[in-house]
Swiss-Prot record:
E.C. no: 2.7.7.23, 2.3.1.157
Cofactor binding, per record: Binds 1 Mg(2+) ion per subunit.
Gene: glmU
Pathway named in the protein's UniProt entry: Nucleotide-sugar biosynthesis; UDP-N-acetyl-alpha-D-glucosamine biosynthesis; N-acetyl-alpha-D-glucosamine 1-phosphate from alpha-D-glucosamine 6-phosphate (route II): step 2/2; Nucleotide-sugar biosynthesis; UDP-N-acetyl-alpha-D-glucosamine biosynthesis; UDP-N-acetyl-alpha-D-glucosamine from N-acetyl-alpha-D-glucosamine 1-phosphate: step 1/1; Bacterial outer membrane biogenesis; LPS lipid A biosynthesis
A GO-annotated cellular component: cytoplasm
Pfam families: Hexapep (PF00132), NTP_transferase (PF00483)
Principal EC category: transferase
Name assigned to this protein: Bifunctional protein GlmU
Length: 458
């Protein structure tokens, strides 16, 4: 049987108190809407139809070719939102999943189980439900003595008995597609909210003696719909635990998983050690047996095997096997560190390629440079790459020794095996096997200090 999906993403999300559409707020590095789409993909829908409204263009920009779009100009309830998809789906045979775009914790496995349950029980409609300790605010699932679903009652419309029911409607459903759109023609706004409730189609099916079922989630957390920043933080917490648990099962050691932030698309090999307060973001990849210490932040970077990163930040760069970075180093976008490079404390590298076994131990800036292998940077070395308007390249050969407090003014080339004397300002190219000295001779004026204000007075 063919599957389709309707994703509800038209709401403003007033309680979020944000200029951004609710479904575009992020959980673990992805928008809530992207999380939903990844889960929906597990049912292999032939067509996704996203109902958009508030700031529709922003939602379209996130999804692009992943979905068809229909516009809901007025938000008149969930039933009204699904009506908007009629032009795309009404005449098609198959099953249609209806899901809200603000449910980032729902898993693909649960949606696949929901579809299978629906098909196996030959239902015209199947509701995804959950058991809640505190069901206040949720629509209740009302069953008869034969345990069949009779109706769904919203909180504001529920009587005293119905409000005690703990089985709640998650807002996710599967319908026979044609019967869904036929039933939608018969719902109205005669309720406390004055809206078109999608849940009213369940009552219509029951009145017609059609089969309605309910599939109960194993994990209540999956049912969370995010309506405010408190729920967003809850979703973030649950997702973080879920992601970190998966990495631990795959052989990653966490010093404190509750204090480690790893986004959804990060890849980590076995035998990696991650200390507390580490953040791994974007499409970062961490190689086997690497160690990330407290305070490290890695964004969209590729980290090799047996790398040690100590309390440092690495962005959009490639780090080869055996490299050590930090503490307090910053590897900025566009950098490549080859095998066994050492970048020490308070060193910044930007847009540079650094060859194997090169060392910059402390207090150094390497920007827009191509550096060979076995180079040593003395403390305080600066590549002067910017004149206020343009950036210039520094090229350093193999086995070069750069003396402490050298200032290398680009554009500049230093040949293999060359040396720059400590304290030099280098403005011209240095030939291989040469030493470059670019500093004034020391001058000593005996007794001159007595004339200066700092000198102790008798």
């Amino acid at each position: 049987m063919t599957n389709y999906a309707i994703i509800l993403a038209a709401g403003k999300g007033t309680r979020m108190k944000s200029d951004l559409p609710k479904v575009l707020h992020q959980v673990s590095g992805l928008t809530m809407l992207e999380h939903v789409f990844r889960s929906v993909a597990h049912i292999t829908p032939q067509m996704n139809v996203t109902v958009i409204g508030h700031k529709a263009e922003l939602v379209q920009e996130v999804l692009k070719e992943k979905s068809e779009f229909v516009l809901q100009t007025e938000q008149l309830g969930t039933g009204h939102a699904v009506m908007m998809a009629e032009e795309k789906l009404a005449d098609l045979e198959g099953n249609t999943l209806v899901i809200a775009g603000d449910t980032p914790l729902i898993t693909g496995e649960s949606l696949k189980n929901l579809i299978d349950f629906h098909v196996n029980h030959k239902n015209v409609a199947t509701i995804l439900t959950a058991k809640a300790e505190d069901p206040f605010g949720y629509g209740r699932i009302i069953r008869n003595h034969d345990d069949e679903v009779v109706k769904i009652v919203e909180q504001k419309d529920a009587n005293e008995y119905e409000q005690k029911v703990k089985e709640i409607n998650t807002g996710t459903y599967v319908f026979d597609n044609k019967r869904l759109f036929e039933a939608l023609k018969n719902i109205n706004t005669n309720n406390a909210q004055g809206e078109y409730y999608l849940t009213d189609v369940i009552s219509i099916f029951r009145e017609n003696k059609e089969k309605v079922g309910a599939y109960v989630l194993r994990d209540f957390n999956e049912s969370l719909g995010v309506n405010d920043r408190v729920a967003l933080a809850t979703a973030e917490s649950v997702m973080r635990r879920r992601i970190n648990k998966a990495h631990m099962i795959n052989g990653v050691t966490f010093q404190n998983p509750d204090a480690t932030y790893i986004e959804a698309d990060v890849s980590i090999a076995a035998d990696v050690m991650i200390e507390a307060n580490v953040s791994l973001k974007g499409n970062s990849c961490i190689g086997a047996k690497s160690v990330l210490t407290n305070g490290t932040c890695i964004v969209d970077a590729q980290i090799g095997e047996s790398v040690v990163i100590t309390n440092s930040t690495i962005e959009e760069s490639s780090i080869a096997d055996g490299v050590t970075v930090g503490p307090y180093a910053h590897i900025r976008p566009g950098s490549q560190l080859d095998k066994n490079v050492h970048i020490g404390n308070f060193v910044e590298v930007k847009g540079s390629h650094i060859g194997e076994n090169t060392k910059a131990g402390h207090l150094t800036y390497i920007g827009n440079a191509v550096v060979g292998s076995d180079v040593n940077f003395g403390a305080g070395t600066i590549t002067v790459n910017y004149d206020g308007k343009n950036k210039y390249k520094t090229v350093i050969g193999n086995n070069v020794f750069v003396g402490s407090n050298s200032t290398l003014i680009a554009p500049l080339e230093i040949g293999d095996n060359a040396l720059t004397a400590a304290g030099s300002t280098i403005t011209k190219n240095v030939e291989p096997d040469s030493i470059a000295i670019g500093r004034s001779r020391q001058v000593i004026k005996e007794g001159y200090a007595k004339r200066l204000p700092h000198y102790p007075q008798k």
